Each structure stands twice: as C-alpha cells, then as structure tokens.
Design a protein with these regions (language model features):
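Bacterial Sec-dependent N-terminal signal peptides
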Residues: 1-26, 34
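Interaction-mediating elements
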Residues: 22-149
Length: 149
C-alpha cells in the first residue's frame, strides 16, 4: 500500500502546476545523487515544491524527464516522456485490446522503488482516459472523464 501511495505521489507531483512551486533551489546532497545517476543531463532546473520535495527537470539523450527527491535528498522516482511507439509492446497491445482505436496525447514512463510503470493519456470518442499500466501490460488504474466541448 505504501508503495502504491509513493507511486501515485510521484505521478500527481509530476502533473502539479508550476504555480505550486516556489524557490528554485536545490540540495547539495540531491545534486550529488543526481549527477551520479544522470551524468550528461542538460537543461537542468531544480524546483522546491510546497511539500518539501525537490523536482529536477532535465533532458538526457534528447528525452525530457523529471526526477523527484524527498527531504532527505533520496531519489524517490523519475518520470520520462515517451512517444507512444517507445512503450513496451505489452503496454501497446493492452491499450489496443482493451480500448481499441485511440488518439494518444501523452505517454510517460514512471520509475520508482516499485519498479517501472507507464501512464498513457488518450482520447476516445467523447472521453479522455488516463491509464496506468505495469511493464507487463497489466492495467493498474483507469481514470476517465467526459470531454467538454
């Protein structure tokens, strides 16, 4: 349960508006961990969030990503932007089999202590879906809302 909460916290925090962020400072301990784990990262921007967590946005090998550090400067998770075709085949097949034809808006890879999962946001007919899947293509969570026109 704790792992699920941490996973959800990373996803929710990743979608927080920059308005919730304040001083763009970092922690030297987190900077050290970051530089070891993400050597070669560019366009690095540190932001301290209202909950005390640090978010670092960066580009690594041409791919945008964000990592999150807790108050003790421990890395709690990383969210990486992907193209739909970069998702594991099992994830793509599950979406195709369960939802049929979709218009994918966003695909993200979430890595934390629980492992790797994927969040795919897509539209279908008059609904917008946010689906979280395991690396094996198992659906972990589905949220849907009606598209207002």
């Amino acid at each position: 349960m704790k792992n699920l909460i941490v996973s959800l916290a990373v996803v929710v925090t990743a979608s927080l508006n920059p308005v919730l962020a304040h001083a763009t400072d970092s922690d030297p301990r987190a900077e050290k961990v970051f530089s070891e784990k993400f050597a070669g990262a560019q366009n690095i921007k540190w932001t301290r969030l209202d909950d005390g967590y640090l978010r670092v946005s960066f580009v690594l090998n041409g791919v945008g990503a964000e990592s999150y550090f807790d108050r003790d400067a421990a890395l709690v998770g990383t969210v990486r932007n992907l193209f739909y075709g970069q998702l594991p085949l099992s994830v793509i097949q599950t979406i195709a089999n369960k939802f049929g034809e979709t218009c994918v808006i966003e695909a993200k890879e979430i890595t934390n202590e629980d492992g790797t999962s994927y969040k795919v946001i897509f539209e279908q007919k008059e609904r917008k879906y946010s689906v979280r899947l395991s690396s094996l293509g198992e659906v972990m969570d589905v949220q849907k809302e009606k598209i207002k026109k």
